[in-house]
Amino acid sequence: MDVTGAPYSSGLNVRNVLLTESTSTFTPIETYNVQDDIRTIRISAKIAEESVVSRVPLPVSFKPISEITKLFDIIPISRGSTTSIVEHPQTSFMIKLRDNTFSDYACLDHLVAFEPALILHRLKMLFSILGKYASSIISEVPTLDVMIDNAQVTVIDMSKFDDRNMNTYADRLPRDIEVYAAKQDILKQYVRTSVNETPITFRDDLPMPVRERPTLYRRYIVPFTPVELSLYNMALQMLDLQYCHPLIVYKYLQDRAPPFLVVNDQIGLEMLSAGDGELLPRPVMEVLDYSLVYSSPLALNNLGSLLMSRIKTSIKVRSINEVSSSLSEIVNASSTVSNSASSAIANMNVAGVETIAAFIIRSVLNPNISYAMIGKLDLDAFNDFIYGTCLLLLQAITPPSAIAAMSRVRINNALAYFLLRYICPQPVYTRLLQNDVIPSLTNTLEWSSVDRDILAAIYSNLFVADGRIWNLVSRYYRELPPEEVTQVSVPARETSYGINETRGISLPYLFGDAITEMRPDNRLNDYKQRLNLPSRSPILIANPMRNNVVDLTNVNVKMDFIMDLYDQNNFLKSPAQWVRNSASNSALLAKFRDSVSNITGILENVLSNAYSNAVNTYCDSVYRAGVPLNWKYRVVIDPKDMMFVIFGVCPRYVLMGDSIPDFFAGSEDILILQLVRAIWEVMSNHMGNVPTRFFRMEDVQRDLSEMVSIVLSKKIDVTKYFTDDMRSTTFSKEAWERFIARQIGEELPPLYRTILDQVETINNYMEQMMSIMPIVDHFYVVRNSGIAARGSVNPILAATTLNLNQINTTMIIRDWSELVRLVMTQQRVDLNTSHSLFEAEFYKLSEIASNEFVRSNERGEAEPHFTDVEAIRINMYARYELKIYKEQGEFSKPTKLNKVMHEDLTSFVKSNIGKPYPPVFTIPIDIMLNDLGECTSTKTRMRSFKVDEYFKCFTGAQVIIPLDYVNLEHVGSIQDLQVMFNGSVSVRIKPWTIKENFDVNYVQTGNHEVLIDPLPNVLPI
């Protein structure tokens, strides 16, 4: 018979038997219950919710086309002249790349001016596009039925397209006849048509009725550029990669099941009868190394929800009325007045038994997944002897890691407060107070602090001759000397909560072991070793003895302490609860002592759960103080819930339900770690060397985290997977290098490898996009600049820059290093002043006055009196930020324009002087578009002072990017606009139906005999 015992009132022997497939490298393990008299396996299995068979890495979403992200802005203008009113202004359009299109995941804003950084920047863009566009399928295009040439045609409903409503732009045309003609062209162009080829066929061999075919789709011409739509069209490929018809899943699950399992008939029928367009996550089967889970505390915590779902309790309890009646008789027989004991009995919480059991089970399975705060804990906690008794008994069956350090310190301080008030002799109290060992009892603020363990401080300053208080404190600390009690197991700096983990806040719990040395439950170690599973085990809650007896030494020792603590003969001053109630209180305490063995009912459940779950990857007995509390499940425990545990639980030998680890449990974290490795290799291949050859480790980890997060569609911080040790959350370069150098036995699963291949495919689209990105590899420094197209009908009237043909380069600064040298090298001008070499070169440039840039002739036409502008060219990456205004004839000075002066560049250099490669220098460019055709004012607009001052506002910038480099495309007519925004998209008439997290239950088929004890010497004697 094993230690979990026999079923209650039954003579059947029951054992847990591990079964695995023929190869020990296949790690998903099943644990089954086997009854000796039947010798068949009882099955209950479920596919893990967070597994590769029920979760896709990049879930495909469906969006109406109105929600599709646009890459370009359309800016309509009616071009006029600064010199006269144009009777029929020409309507044209400026096409501008949206500023924030590719700024996600720290792309443009954090680009550094260094070639490997540019490569990395582009690589991050690829992943950004993969997650943002290539996983969104266009599922809806709004349409209208209209009559065109006496035929009904389904056309695009332009009113639903906001700034892509081509009719809005047609309304900007100057003549009504032009507006009408343009709208007719729009109706005929943007229509719905049939599909000749199926956009997606899936790669599976399916019966004809459920195959994809052209008749299931429609094609639409929409006002988007082909580049914009091509990104979304890739989502169909992602759909094929990650999803399949339920028939494929059914076949996979049947092939995967052991000989004695079959997919539940009802679920199987649902999959077999699925029609076309129904999809499930495509199953992926890989042999994965579970040891990767142990490389990171985060990987363990990700299994926390799985741990909690595996907890099962089976507790037999007495009727609460029966318990209340029995206890009330004791209290009432011993007292003639109402007391707190009566109140506690009346408020006993039956549900608290389950709360306590589940809390302790969770705590022993893994001390790093959850923690408890003690409810109703204050300085007067031990005044209530029932609360104090329950709290101390809870300590006896709880590992210290289960209770937040803050609460453990407060418990000690509350006990110290009680001892000093009611048991400590006055001379001892006075000595402790005078020696600054304790604060005054009236200083409740300091007593409530968790900055120090006051009880331990008292112990260090007591003597054996101090009598009762020495005896009680010494026993509370298991009679260890004070120097061991104050010993620090984990310094506060190594914890996430900033409290020293001393022995003093661990000794009162469980076996009294230090929090770093809690005892593991090793009952299944032989199993795990023989199955190549790691040796991690749950925390041992109690010693299972022979004949299914659970050792209660810890509980009994604690109960003896409680009896002495509340012995009224020890009180120098009686607590309020003991005035006129000492007899009833003592009687109830005696009942506690007589009934404390009922805790066995809880310990049985804990031991059984520990035994049943010991093969799961989430089990551990090592406490990691560095794991932040906010990574854990938080629960508030009311110690008084222990009251019904003591008086209401009926111990029995109980075997828990089926112990069956979920299929593929832990694979999510394995895939994360394997993706980290694979994407690291992608980065290295793109750069020609490992990324840390060019960048700081923290920057690499940040970028790596972004890319892994995109592929997994969940926020991943790679640094949290690699720490100095399991007590820290600080990224460790050494741990990372060990991971990278480690030989991983299994390659990335094909699904994820294909997804990474898709990243390379997207690169083709990015090549087109990079040519219009607002990035240049050089810029210029001049004394003055400005563009003023006075008297013209050009689309651009003014800009805070120059045209390239206006620039005369007199000096070239080769790179960042040379710029730094010039800025930081000083030369003396005279005895009192000096300036940098860069300033010297700057002041050598000829200066052109602002009036020259805006000069005009008698007709108001621009007539600058200079041929070129001397400039210094700096070969360094820069980004321009475009701000666009429209001028409609008022010629009011625009709000303050952004201009970069040579001093700004100098400050930029000095602020980044310690960096080998600086951030990209950002240069704003303000542009005024010609929308004068909208103005019908008859005011003179030729050579007025107001117009002069208006154009002069655009002069003065000294660090510029030529206007020629700015991607601002001019489209001269609405017909050309329609040609540019003429994309097509195929949409399924009936959208796909996708079921994520599809649960599959296996049921038993036939008998499958197994050896009851497949491995010798496994179970304790």
From Swiss-Prot:
GO terms for molecular function: structural molecule activity. It comes from the Viruses. The keyword ATP-binding does not apply. It is found in: Virion; Host cytoplasm. InterPro entries: Inner_layer_core_VP3_Reovir, Innr_layr_core_VP3_Phytoreovir. GO terms for cellular component: host cell cytoplasm; viral outer capsid. Keywords: Capsid protein, Host cytoplasm, Outer capsid protein, Virion. Belongs to the phytoreovirus inner capsid protein P3 family. Homodimer. Homomultimer. Capsid protein which self-assembles to form the inner icosahedral capsid with a T=2 symmetry, and consisting of 60 P3 dimers. This is Outer capsid protein P3.
